[in-house]
Amino acid sequence: MDQKSDSAGKCPVAHTAPRGRSNRDWWPDQLDVQVLHRHSGLSDPLGNTFNYAEEFKKLDLDALKRDLRALMTDSQDWWPADFGHYGGLFIRMAWHSAGTYRITDGRGGAGQGQQRFAPLNSWPDNANLDKARRLLWPIKQKYGNRISWADLLILTGNVALESMGFKTFGFAGGRVDVWEPEELFWGPEGTWLGDERYSGERQLSEPLAAVQMGLIYVNPEGPNGNPDPVAAARDIRETFARMAMNDEETVALIAGGHTFGKTHGAGDPSFIGADPEGGAIEDQGLGWKSTFGTGVGKDAITGGPEVTWSQTPTRWSNHFFENLFNHEWELTKSPAGAYQWKAKNAEATIPDAYDPSRKHVPTRLTTDLSLRFDPAYEKISRRFLENPDEFADAFARAWFKLTHRDMGPKVRYLGPEVPAEDLIWQDVIPAVDHRLVDETDIAGLKAKIIASGLSVQELVSTAWASASTFRGSDKRGGANGARIRLAPQKDWEVNRPAQLARVLSVLEGIQRDFNAAQTDGKKISLADLIVLAGGAAVEKAAKAGGHDITVPFTPGRMDASEAQTDAASFAALEPRADGFRNYVSTTRQQFMKPEEALVDRAQLLTLTAPEMTVLVGGLRVLKAGEPKHGVFTSRPEALTNDFFVNLLDMGTQWSPIEGEEGVYEGRDRRTGAARWTGTRVDLIFGSHSQLRAFAEVYAQSDAREKFVKDFVAAWTKVMNADRFDLV
């Protein structure tokens, strides 16, 4: 009674601590499917009808850039501009917005404006970037929804560079804001700057691309604060590579970014207050309040080092390399106690940020010296020292790549400053250069495909393999381009290379015959034909299950060439596991349980939990994956709800198969006769209470037609995931 009366009349939603234990607290190993339901319209104040691309077209970009240029030198007392110019601050803001990108899973990056939210807004490496965004607020307020925060952060970095005399490579809008934090795996650590992500001989766990929790890349003082430039170079090379940058791009980015501005280590970090998320309500989201002196300007503390790189920190120059090679360096410490380096026996040539009468000797970060003392970096750095124009071009291109890497193909780019040049990292797909097939052609092609002798399983598997590489994170992959016929995808184990080659050979023959027979310039690409063939197979399977349905198909895909494909970059898209195909690699290290990998892939495919559920059930009965397990039907290649019916049959008792990790045997509960074998991914739909609820819907007697319709809708969503031209 006491317990009941204590809670009577209280709101059931916990708003403040202390709070009751959540399900995850009670069952920490429970599979989290809520990641599939984030960023819904329920959290979007602009509503489902808002079209950012249309709003961006109304933007007066020239006027916006004029306002941004004016802001650069409009120093505010509450956060004064170093050297009278905010350029360095805004370059860091843009860099750190984009720099969370990681090629392994395509997550992070500037594409959603996540720097506004926790945890990124409170990472130690993002200290005082809250001030940069507050400086931008009057401009964002003025231009409203015509410029997203995500675009504004990057555009401001570009304008900062241009205002200081640098010619940028271009700018593309098109980043759409989200309205809640992205709950990503940023590392296993429970403390800022922890480094539990390493194992063995400094092996950085995937998919992580930073050396410590709360850093963008590396520790500027050196690995774990050890001021060793050569050891730091190893960290730099690995973290930048995981952001898809090669050595030349890495050197250009570090040197180019460190041509401007300064770091801030005026005093002991103990003077710094709470980060934005941990601050008092009256702080209004401004964090890192410092009680050292004035706390701002000459007294600012952002990190540890106190370094200015150039004699002209508000103008583009080659001073970074000139100073790097023209001096010898000795280890010292900043006023904050951080390791840094100063030029030996050097004149004081570096201006003070706030006192024009003062000069300082040149200083460097440990990671700056890596560009001189690592042999590969040193060779590139000397070339840039001797060829300033080459350095400027390399930095312009690397900066554009840094800030646009997660935007996907150029068809998503908006605005008048989009560069005309195609870049291989954009995963170029040729423009449509022929008439597209019509409904009559489509019907004829379907008939030829079905009559070709290829099975439902072969056609569905090939279409799924082609389309399911899509990543909603960085908009890479997908069926457009037909890169499944090229290295490395054609050789991936998950794609069953021998079967894939046979299917593609037949489809290419159908394509050749059709295209050769046309007299009006009409053609079909292999990319389109692969998707059409998968749809035709699904229709055949539905008919075998007693349902007539048409799988939607929109032509317009094109075939990319080998020259347009960076094979090494596409290697990152190879799945270690694909629960939709019941595949787990036995030769590559696994970082997740198979069912977790399924949810992870579903999230990359932008699927909801019900969509994931219906796709797994359909793909199993169509035998689209591992043929031995999970095919819970006596009618394979017929699109039925048998997977769910048989999984939930209480007449079946499941037990692990000895010697086969993650594989289970289902036997008749009464007779002990073997019925099925399944994997963890199969059984999770009966074990996990929420997924079981979805499975029950599709196992119902009245759900057969709904199952087919829902499968076709989810299938079509995946097939069209990369069709940005249809949006």
Swiss-Prot record:
Any GO CC annotation of this UniProt entry: cytosol
Tryptophyl-tyrosyl-methioninium (Tyr-Met) (with W-95) cross-link, chain position(s): 217-243
Residues the record marks as site: Transition state stabilizer: 92
EC number: 1.11.1.21
UniProt entry keywords in alphabetical sequence: Heme, Hydrogen peroxide, Iron, Metal-binding, Oxidoreductase, Peroxidase, Plasmid
Catalytic residues, chain numbering: 96
Disordered as annotated region, ranges: 1-24
Catalysed reactions listed for this entry: H2O2 + AH2 = A + 2 H2O; 2 H2O2 = O2 + 2 H2O
Keyword Cytoplasm included in the entry's annotation: no
Molecular function GO labels: catalase activity; heme binding; metal ion binding
Annotated positions binding heme b: 258
GO biological process, one term: hydrogen peroxide catabolic process
UniProt PTM comment: Formation of the three residue Trp-Tyr-Met cross-link is important for the catalase, but not the peroxidase activity of the enzyme.
Cofactor binding: number and manner: Binds 1 heme b (iron(II)-protoporphyrin IX) group per dimer.
Cofactor(s) this protein requires: heme b
Cross-link Tryptophyl-tyrosyl-methioninium (Trp-Tyr) (with M-243) placement: 95-217
InterPro entries: Catalase_peroxidase, Haem_peroxidase, Haem_peroxidase_sf, Peroxidases_AS, Peroxidases_heam-ligand_BS
EC class: oxidoreductase
Protein family membership: Belongs to the peroxidase family. Peroxidase/catalase subfamily.
Its biological purpose: Bifunctional enzyme with both catalase and broad-spectrum peroxidase activity.
Subunit structure: Homodimer or homotetramer.
Protein's name according to its UniProt entry: Catalase-peroxidase
Chain's gene name: katG
